[in-house]
Amino acid sequence: IIGGYECKPHSQPWQAFLVDNK
């Protein structure tokens, strides 16, 4: 996974996608 986001207010749609793809 690129970047370490976890249930955060993602501004970009690709960020949310990556988080969901964990």
From Swiss-Prot:
Give the E.C. number(s). 3.4.21.-
Write the signal peptide boundaries: none
Activity regulation reads: Not inhibited by the metalloproteinase inhibitor EDTA.
Q: How does activity depend on temperature?
A: Optimum temperature is 55 degrees Celsius.
Keywords (alphabetical) are: Cytoplasm, Hydrolase, Protease, Serine protease
Keyword Flavoprotein included in the entry's annotation:
no
pH dependence, entry free text: Optimum pH is 8.0. Active from pH 5.0 to at least 9.0.
What protein family does this chain belong to?
Belongs to the peptidase S1 family.
Q: What is the official name of this protein in its record?
A: Myofibril-bound serine protease
Query: Which organism is this protein's natural source?
Result: Cyprinus carpio (Common carp)
